[in-house]
Curated annotation (Swiss-Prot):
Subcellular localization: Cell membrane
Bilayer-crossing regions: 6-25
GO CC annotations on file: plasma membrane
Protein's name according to its UniProt entry: Transmembrane regulatory protein ToxS
Keyword Membrane on entry: yes
InterPro entries, per the entry: ToxS
Keyword annotations: Cell membrane, Membrane, Transmembrane, Transmembrane helix
Membrane topology designation: Single-pass membrane protein
Subcellular location, principal: membrane
Record flagged with keyword NAD: no
Subunit relationships: Interacts with the C-terminal periplasmic domain of ToxR, possibly by binding and stabilizing spontaneously forming ToxR dimers.
Gene it is expressed from: toxS
Length: 173
């Protein structure tokens, strides 16, 4: 009888320790990240003091992204970057397809972009090729940030960057 109580105590202790390790480990984050396709939307307002900044007459940028983190450690992201000029009437669109590798370490998502493709079909009238390349380069630099990952709920994840604030990823599926 006493051996049975000892065995039950060891089993309960093992169960508690295992669940604590599971919920506190990177494995849970990996499971949530790979479980579905994630979306995000970001709006940036740009104020400049000069008449013709390096990025042209840019006043606002809207970025809508869909990303899928795959169990093999790679990811695919498709982003639609809408550029608005100072008068807010003309809109230029850059479609960017991104492929890379990802890893989780101590609740931080480490992303290494491997390939970017501009899959846009039209060119802008308000922005020169050099300005569009600069904007695309800034987008690529932002993709290389490491971010802390917090699970808000099963359909919402919070990414916190060390320098650029936070991003919420959500899933409708």
């Amino acid at each position: 009888m006493q051996n049975r109580h000892i065995a039950m105590g060891i089993l309960l202790l093992s169960l508690l320790l295992s669940s604590w390790l599971y919920w506190g480990s990177d494995f849970k984050l990996e499971q949530v990240l790979t479980s579905r396709e994630w979306q995000s939307k970001m709006v940036s307002l740009i104020k400049t003091n000069s008449n013709r900044p390096a990025m042209g007459p840019l006043s606002r940028v809207d970025v809508t992204s869909n990303v899928k983190y795959l169990p093999n450690g790679t990811y695919l992201r498709v982003s639609i970057v809408k550029l608005f000029s100072d008068d807010n009437s003309a809109e230029s669109v850059i479609n960017i397809s991104e492929f890379g590798e990802w890893d989780i370490s101590d609740n931080y998502l480490l992303v290494t972009p491997v390939e970017f493709k501009d899959i846009s079909s039209n060119q802008s009238k308000d922005f020169t090729d050099e300005q569009l390349q600069l904007i695309t380069q800034l987008f690529k630099m932002d993709a290389q940030q490491s971010r802390r990952v917090d699970i808000v709920n099963e359909r919402t994840i919070l990414f916190t960057s060390l320098s650029h604030g936070s991003t919420v990823l959500f899933s409708n599926s």
